[in-house]
Amino acid sequence: MVTGNMLWSGEDKAMVASVLGKEAFEYLMSGSVSAECSLMAIGNDQNLQNKLSDLVERPNAANFSWNYAIFWQISRSKSGELVLGWGDGCCREPKEAEEREVKKILNLRLDDEGQQRMRKRVLQKLHMLFGGTDEDNYAFGLDRVTDTEMFFLASMYFSFPRGEGGPGKCFGSGKYLWLSDALTSNLDYCARSFLAKSAGMQTIALIPTDVGVVELGSVRSIPESLELLQNIKSCFSSFLSLVRDKQAAGIAAVPEKNEGNNPRLSNSGAVTERTDGNPKIFGHDLNSGTHFREKLAVRKAEERPWDMYQNGNRMPFVNARNGLNPASWAQFSNVKLGKPVELYAPPTPGHNLMNGGREEFRLNNFQHQKPAARMQIDFTGATSRTIVSPAHNVESEHSDVEASCKEDRAGPVDEKRPRKRGRKPANGREEPLNHVEAERQRREKLNQRFYALRAVVPNISKMDKASLLGDAIAYITELQKKLRDMESERELRLGSTSRDAITSEDSPSSEIQIRGPDINIEAANDEVIVRVSCSLETHPLSRIIQIFKEAQINVVESKLSAGNGTVYHTFVIKSSGSEQLTKEKLLAAFSSESNSLRQLSPKLHKVILPSLF
């Protein structure tokens, strides 16, 4: 089977099916959306990553945060088909307490080296299948792929036409889905159910908005919360849908209910039950100056290298967060790709909004537009960028939207940059995700440290990291023991006298004043007698005298003579032991001294030994 310019053998198919699950593998291979068709998002919320990160990385008042958050965005394939494609996402690894909770229900398998190789191989094949190249294949740089990362990274390659898969069905019906027991339930909410269960996800929530579907997951079992659903829907809906929500809040105070008591969240983004004030999520005001609220602006849509159609014309789509209503699925489904298309707002009276009527933006050709009524944005040569401050009421917000869309200023033409085909992991980012890339770099740095440690440890029992750390600890302990032994031996060689001298020098209360040598000169007849006296500590032969004392040998007489450049010092000693024993004792004493004394000892022996025998 040739798919995506790759030949997949039966072994490759079995490997991919074992990692992704049979249903997910068949879904990707079924060709619901051609693997060779890149997707272009209709609208590009530049603040989307921050919103998803807050849901995952910032716990709420109850110290809860989701394990992953994905936004499935309305996208258009190269063939013009409208699908829900990967918009952006964020994930984190389960905490220790969360893992214990999952293990009670699901026996998590241990990832061996073979399983890791299979996961990396599957990610590489998926990357190539969807038009990627070896140069930008991030799977080659992954050290280890966890269950959560495998589920998250594999999800990037899925897309859902209307009515297919969990996100497609949810968006088509306008009804949310909340599963609190996904691990034990037999319901497969999506083709990715096998991957979600492998990652230990107990709670799965799919929340439709007017621009896509928000998918949330947690390894904890979370009860359904209507307030949380409304907050998330308000946060991820387009700006104009929030304006309509404020109008609807003054009319309908009771939420509309569907069959089965399941509150319906309409595709238009209207939430029928709202409280007074601005919508909030996790305590953040959506209409305040926080990062949840982006300034209203009209920007040039990003040009894609593949958006040239049969007649050479381009299909522009405006930013969903820039004040223009992103078209719903039904609005884009009947668009003909023959002529350039623009979005404009018909002159709708203000009372229509107050009566609950929906303000729609229609698709039409340029030749049918009236200059006074159209809201035109030229995506080919100029860009309009009018910034409007956040409004405080419905009337001012509506007027600000119209004003921002009518004022156009000429801008520089953006330089076209060639892009590689294939689906990027997120909107305009080369890395799969910031936190995934950071984790990969941390592991690479840790591995480099282990490689360096392995190079300096001489004896390695096993090649795994735990054994390497144990061997390194044993080696360091051995080196410390050798150091202590060498220090002890050095202290013994210094001798007890040196230690006593060092101790006396360190103690301020026992300072010894070392006197210089006393010189006495006497003249008698024709001779001059010179006597030099000094303390034993300062005498050059003090160590020899000390050796005699330690050997219990008395010095009877000492003679000094000089000749031929050599000084001879002769000692006449007396010992209580035998002559042979005295000789051996002196030889042993002199041999234990420093190198200088050992070099001097043979000469002394020649002087001393004849005096003994």
From Swiss-Prot:
Keyword check for Lyase: no
Keywords per UniProt: Jasmonic acid signaling pathway, Nucleus, Plant defense, Transcription, Transcription regulation
Matching Pfam families: bHLH-MYC_N, HLH
Induction text: Induced by wounding, feeding with herbivorous insects, infection with the fungal pathogen Botrytis cinerea and infection with the bacterial pathogen Pseudomonas syringae pv tomato DC3000.
Polar residues bias locations: 260-270, 495-512
GO biological process, one term: defense response
Alphabetized PANTHER family for the sequence: MYC (PTHR11514), TRANSCRIPTION FACTOR MTB1 (PTHR11514:SF107)
Residue segments, region Helix-loop-helix motif: 444-479
Region (Disordered): 256-285, 391-441, 490-513
InterPro entries in the cross-refs: AIB/MYC-like, bHLH_dom, HLH_DNA-bd_sf, MYC/MYB_N
UniProt biased composition (Basic and acidic residues): 394-417, 427-441
Location of the region described as Basic motif in the Swiss-Prot/TrEMBL record: 430-443
SUPFAM superfamilies to which the protein is assigned, alphabetical: HLH, helix-loop-helix DNA-binding domain
Domain bHLH: residue ranges: 430-479
Major subcellular location class: nucleus
Molecular function terms, GO-annotated: DNA-binding transcription factor activity; protein dimerization activity; transcription cis-regulatory region binding
Organism from which the protein derives: Solanum lycopersicum (Tomato)
UniProt keyword Transcription, yes or no: yes
Record's GO cellular component terms: nucleus
Protein name: Transcription factor MTB1
Span list, region JAZ-interaction domain: 48-130
Annotated compartments: Nucleus
Subunit note: Interacts with MYC2 (via N-terminus). MTB1 competes with MED25 for binding to MYC2. Interacts (via N-terminus) with JAZ7.
